[in-house]
Amino acid sequence: RSPSRGLGDVYKRQALILCAGFGKRLNPLTEKIPKPLLELNNVTLLENCINLVIKLGIKKIFLNTFHLSDLIISFIKKKNFQIEIQIVEDGKEILDTGGGILNMMKKSSDEDFIIFNPDTLWNKTYHEEIIKMQNFYFSNKLNNALLLTNKTLSCLLYTSPSPRDGLL
């Protein structure tokens, strides 16, 4: 599981981007537009997230959809991002966060993922923090890691022991 790349290098892992939710807290905005396609400064939240993933050097994105999935799929096709993006539809009912992640993981042969919520506002300093998190994750052979930020925008890293029975 330990990558052959040296610390400080970006690991060419896969990203999972969670785009299936209803965005209920942003109603009525999200009744006709999925939350990942809402714009800030003429850039969608999803595009901002994908651009960060590309900057990290990741080669493939799994993107789950459910609510207004046709709009997200159309957006991805129209933008023609310079990265492989595989759409994974939740199916007939929404799988929630854990189910969506598990569904995407089943589509990949890789065992390490970086998971993104597109409604997180990523600024330029997060690129460095994500690389630090990856380095810490691999050098310490962790089972999972979570990057957090506080009101002062200083980043924190949370890790936990192995999940029991394979549960998160």
What residues fall within each predicted segment?
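Single conserved hydrophobic/aromatic residue that forms the stacking wall/gate
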Residues: 1-11, 158-168
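N-terminal nucleotide-binding beta1-loop-alpha1 segment
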Residues: 9-31, 56
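Conserved N-terminal catalytic core of the sugar/cofactor nucleotidyltransferase
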Residues: 13, 17, 43-117, 128
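Active-site metal-binding loops of divalent metal-dependent hydrolases
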Residues: 22, 119-120
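Short clusters of hydrophobic/aromatic residues that line enzyme substrate/ligand-binding pockets
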Residues: 26-29, 37, 95, 160
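Short catalytic helix/loop segments, enriched in acidic residues and glycine
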Residues: 32-45
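Conserved core of the sugar-phosphate nucleotidyltransferase
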Residues: 123-164
